[in-house]
Amino acid sequence: MIIFLSIEWNNQKTFGEFDTYTKILNSFFLSVNFRTAGFNSIDLSGLKDSSLFYSTLLMMTGAGQGGTAGGMKITTIAVLIIMVFFVLKQSNQEPHIFKRTIEQKLINKAAAIVMFSSAYVLFVTLLLVETQDYPFVRILFEVVSAFCTVGVSVGDGGILSLSSLFDDFGKSIIIISMIAGRLGVFAFGLLIVGKAKTTHFKYPVGRIII
């Protein structure tokens, strides 16, 4: 909320003409909206690029695990933050919080979600940047909104979404992104790489320098 306020406070295309109360209310609404809702209280085409980029971070993070919103989910990000904290501490303890250990399998799953989601969004964004004549940040916003099933668009300054101005190839990519995001990372990944075969042996540990 504070980030939106600080960036858009004097932007005449968004918050500039509002009084202080309305500015605060709109910044709060935006900070919630980009994580789940898909509504507009202002014309999003007027947002500065820094606000649009911050919005993509909110959309990628998403909402809580029990909700219907898209994104990687708050708990996924939290698990990775806790893991990084313990790695930086070089602790010999397993990652834990609130006196509960976080299973390695759960950490691996969280890392896979973040890696796959980030790689997919980056690949599709670069693909659309090369095929559609629009700025990088705005295309990134459209891709993340589609993949995370948020339902917002930066708009064209009128009544149309930016994605509606893409050619047929660009529109198809956005549609595929929405389907991929709704299926979920693991279901979509399973369609691509297939299910692993069951094995009854274990390889020796490899010592790799990082």
Regions found by a protein language model. Give the residues of each.
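Membrane-proximal intracellular helices of multi-pass ion channels
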Residues: 1-210
